[in-house]
Amino acid sequence: MRVIDRKTGKEVVAGDTLIRKDYKGFRHRYEILEYLGSGMVWVKKLTQGDRWVYLSMPLASLQLDEVLI
């Protein structure tokens, strides 16, 4: 299984950093830590207050797609 970024079309692997905007337009940095399977990913999110938050998120919320090879 490969995970592809919808915005750039490039493959995303554990350790990569993504920058995404939330619904209010604020930018957040997400570092991919691990793929949990079944469309979920474990991430480290840098918030506006310069704090790191660890989350499990669906791939779709980070604009990522799973591709089977």
What is the meaning of each model-derived region?
Residues M1-A14:
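Mixed-charge, Lys/Arg-rich low-complexity intrinsically disordered regions
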Residues F26-Y35:
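Short beta-strand-centered aromatic/proline hotspots
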Residues G39-W42:
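Short aromatic-glycine-enriched beta-strand elements
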Residues K45-I69:
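Intrinsically disordered, low-complexity, charged/polar segments
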